């Protein structure tokens, strides 16, 4: 079976990109901590939006979808699931809520990971919920002509429980001994988890939930206010490319995990930057028109009402719609499309 020893990672020489990302994340985390102490009430809307986005996008990456209205109702627990997709979405909502509320009481062990997986499927009858895989799984690609290619073969079912135990032990050891920088240990753990692919279903969603859990446990709370899952979904191809590069040679312990580390750290930093942008708009106490004007200047290319809502969480939908109408009327924005397909772009 593949051996795991996270102590060897500390001997690696990191390039300026990795070191720069780590330094920038710590700087942004410090700024966020200061803001949370000063203005916690103003950020409640950001939490609500991030929960909805995280639940919607993490499931959508795996082809699990419903309407935006239903997503919002499910996340706010104002309705019950109507079908299998909505059952899976409700399960993700439940796990995410547990992580938000109790991350410091969830140790990184196989037992707790299995419990979280069981909750992920708690709204449906899945006999494999909370159990490691019973049959071999494969990471595949389906091409336009219909042929399927195996890109990576994860560990065999009989190897999986021990491997999951080992990566938890290694992670806890290097973090507990302060032997390895958490922002290196977290992507290494998540990458190993994805290569083990411990479940017959739900590995991608569990990896994203574990990323949030690990970040919270190490004092990086950006995922509570800005959806990391939405960031990953927006750059899904880059995510899969980084994962594929880092998987080469994994079974022999000869993988280069740096592409995945850079990808995940870049995603975390981008979320912190978004947090700073949104806080700047919330903080200024501007009239709705000026808030929407400034938010539109933060967007490159086309954007829709939802994009503005994310940047201006304190504004109601009617205030956003009214401001957009005025900006179109004054010639600052151009409007395209109708209904759900409506989008805008700046003219100057």
Q: Which functions belong to the PLM regions below?
A:
Residues 1-348:
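FIC/Doc superfamily catalytic core
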């Amino acid at each position: 079976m593949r051996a795991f020893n996270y102590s060897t990672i500390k001997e690696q020489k990191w390039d300026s990109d990795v070191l720069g990302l780590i330094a920038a994340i710590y700087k942004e985390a410090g700024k966020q901590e200061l803001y949370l102490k000063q203005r916690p009430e103003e950020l409640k809307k950001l939490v609500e939006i991030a929960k909805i986005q995280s639940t919607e996008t993490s499931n959508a990456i795996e082809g699990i979808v419903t309407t935006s209205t239903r997503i919002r109702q499910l996340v706010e627990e104002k309705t019950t699931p109507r079908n299998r997709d909505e059952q899976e979405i409700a399960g993700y909502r439940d796990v995410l809520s547990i992580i938000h509320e109790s991350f410091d009481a969830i140790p990184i062990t196989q037992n707790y990971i299995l419990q979280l997986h069981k909750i992920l499927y708690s709204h449906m009858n899945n006999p494999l919920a909370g159990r490691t895989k019973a049959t071999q799984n494969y990471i595949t690609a389906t091409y336009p002509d219909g042929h399927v290619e195996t890109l990576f073969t994860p560990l065999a079912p009989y190897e999986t429980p021990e491997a999951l135990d080992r990566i938890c032990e290694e992670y806890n050891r290097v973090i507990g001994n302060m032997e390895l920088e958490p922002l290196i240990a977290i992507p290494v753990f998540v990458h190993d988890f994805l290569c083990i692919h411990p479940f017959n279903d739900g590995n991608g969603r569990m990896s994203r939930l574990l990323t949030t859990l690990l970040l919270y446990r190490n004092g990086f709370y950006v995922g509570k206010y800005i959806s990391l899952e939405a960031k990953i979904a927006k750059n899904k191809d880059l995510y899969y490319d980084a994962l594929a590069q880092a998987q080469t040679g994994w079974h022999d312990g000869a993988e280069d995990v740096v592409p995945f580390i850079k990808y995940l750290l870049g995603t975390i930093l981008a979320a912190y930057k978004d947090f700073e942008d949104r806080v700047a708009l919330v903080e200024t106490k501007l009239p709705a028109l000026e808030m929407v004007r400034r938010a539109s200047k933060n967007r490159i290319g086309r954007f829709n009402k939802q994009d503005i809502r994310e940047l201006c969480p304190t504004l109601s939908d009617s205030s956003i719609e009214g401001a957009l109408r005025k900006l179109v009327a004054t010639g600052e924005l151009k409007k395209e499309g109708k209904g759900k397909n409506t989008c805008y772009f700046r003219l100057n």
